From Swiss-Prot:
Protein name (Swiss-Prot/TrEMBL): 50 kDa gamma-zein
Region of interest called Disordered, as start-end residue ranges on this chain: 27-159
Organism: Zea mays (Maize)
Span of the signal peptide: 1-19
Maturation propeptide residues: 287-308
Family, as annotated: Belongs to the gliadin/glutenin family.
Biased composition (Low complexity): 55-119, 130-159
Amino acid sequence: MKLVLVVLAFIALVSSVSCTQTGGCSCGQQQSHEQQHHPQQHHPQKQQHQPPPQHHQQQQHQQQQVHMQPQKHQQQQEVHVQQQQQQPQHQQQQQQQQHQQQHQCEGQQQHHQQSQGHVQQHEQSHEQHQGQSHEQQHQQQFQGHDKQQQPQQPQQYQQGQEKSQQQQCHCQEQQQTTRCSYNYYSSSSNLKNCHEFLRQQCSPLVMPFLQSRLIQPSSCQVLQQQCCHDLRQIEPQYIHQAIYNMVQSIIQEEQQQQPCELCGSQQATQSAVAILTAAQYLPSMCGLYHSYYQNNPCSSNDISGVCN
């Protein structure tokens, strides 16, 4: 916009100068023409009309000055335009330099950050290595301490195991004695019919065959039915204990009835064996179990010392 305004001003000045020149020329021509037509009349005024050439010279000088001034102004404008053109170039150069400096700074910052990251990684790896080495040393020391204590531990452990085994055996013996004792199963008195069946020396092996052949039931058959009924009322895991306690009660009663001279004799032993042998077939006679010694912890006891 500045350039356009300057050009318009310059054109206006040129047009004004041209107009003044044309006006001056017309005036001069008119004066000369009048002088030619009126040479005599206006002759005395020639001296008076001499100054106009000076005026014409002044006008020419002014016109030259006016013409020079626009030229100077135009030159100044061109210089100003060149300066304005140079300024954007200078600004562009400055911007490029700033941009390059920013890139250099960013590159330096990235390099610095990368170097810091490498240093941190190196420090972390070094710390981890130190921690691992410390843990390994601690483990080695702990293992050495364990190795020193290992020779003493097996002896103590073996002694503790032996004590625990002895305690377990003692507890098992106590449990077995309580199980096989007479008072362990409180419902042994419910087997009165089985008790009477064995006292009358009824054979449980023979009874199944006699049931099909005898027309009238004998006392042993009646006791058999009642004994089986009593056994079915007892829980299965307590049947053998109840039978064993019943046999012990029978043997004690016989010992009380017999004189003490026969205690420990062969006759008493045989009677006890016969009772036990008959008692072991009571479950099979009733269809409960096949053998008295099956799952019976008390059947392995020695009956040689029953008469003490």
